[in-house]
């Protein structure tokens, strides 16, 4: 790993082969979204979902990827508002495939393409900016289970059968 690893105030959940990195100010719902995604994985709404870390994670560059790890002191712990700190299954690392920015000041109804990409240590990663007061869960599930619209329309109407991209690195650009 590179020397430029950093500790950041964020949560992360591995879904399938990639992690969703959830950033935002204190109280913006990072832990709640992480827990909701884990439960969505258990319910089969998204691929299997496992906590990487909650509240504080470490990011490091590995080639052209960003790897996220839990802070050692917080590994396997998640805050559930109203219940406190709880133990949770976790993985020791995952490659970041999607970034969700909560309370993002640049969130728009139809964001321009450049708003749907972020750059961490020189690595471009698909991004979902979520405005303050908006529910991030449906946006993240949609990003994980649907593909970007194009001139050809799939009339089957079934977003979950075989055509979802499940955190494809081209999620925001494809």
Residue ranges and their predicted role:
Residues 18-43:
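Glycine-rich phosphate-binding P-loop
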Residues 7-9, 53-54, 112:
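A short, compositionally biased
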Residues 5, 14, 43-44, 90-93, ...:
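Solvent-exposed alpha-helices and their adjacent loops that cap or buttress functional pockets
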Residues 44-101:
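Conserved nucleotide-sensing/catalytic segment adjacent to the nucleotide-binding pocket
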Residues 18-20, 74, 122-123:
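Short acidic/polar mixed-charge low-complexity motifs
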